[in-house]
Amino acid sequence: GIGSPMSTFAIGKNLKETSEVIGHGDFKYKVDKKWGVQNSNNFPVNHCHEMVMDNKNRIFMTTTHPKNNVLIYNQSGKIEGSWSIGYSSAHGLTIVDEGGEEFLYITDPDKHMVCKTDLKGRKILELDYPKEIKEYNSAEDFKPTETTVAPNGDIFIADGYGKDFIIKYDSKGNYIKHFGGRGDKSNQFDCCHGITLDTREKNNPSLLISSRT
């Protein structure tokens, strides 16, 4: 099922099967348990971790099934397409508009990779473990959970299930720097699972990083 703002699109309107409302205050949602239901034989999922919406209001969702790393839904919950890049544990998903063309960044902590694709699933760039950082002895140390991308194309990777570093690359995948790491200090993390870029102050953007514990 999906929770959606009661005033958003057609989702949450004319729901005959449920009157369940979640949330509180001004943020209340009706649950449509039939939204997004698909044939599990044609579109196996296993687990899903993240969704993003493109400029056409389509929803892209990662799954951990190697047959369908990404499922594409329209606003009505119908599947418009699916594709795979061969990942077994697709996790974090970020969408970025680069000059009018949109791209996805997918992390796979089990495959120890980050992949940039177009919206049709064509691989543009892959990043494996950062050999430039001495704490990483092998790919097994690198288990990325999320990415965010700056307006200039710089890529920030949160290694949330690995060494807990935030690793910065340029748009071509060249290593720039890293910071953080696991620990109890104010500049360290313990499972830096999520990361995004706050650009509300255009001249002073900030990284927002969630540390689970």
Name each model feature, range by range:
Residues 14, 32-68:
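Beta-strand-rich domains and repeat architectures in extracellular enzymes and scaffolds
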Residues 9-34:
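Blade/loop signatures of beta-propeller domains
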Residues 33-41, 78-84, 125, 131-137, ...:
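A short beta-strand motif characteristic of beta-propeller blades
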Residues 1-10:
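N-terminal export signals
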Residues 68-70, 112-115, 124, 164-166:
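Structural signal for beta-propeller blades
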Residues 64-65, 109, 160-162, 200, ...:
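Short loop/turn segments immediately following the C-termini of beta-strands
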Residues 42-56, 86-102, 132-154, 184-206, ...:
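Beta-rich, blade/repeat-based domains predominating
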Residues 61-62, 106, 157-158, 209:
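Residue position within the beta-strands of beta-propeller blades
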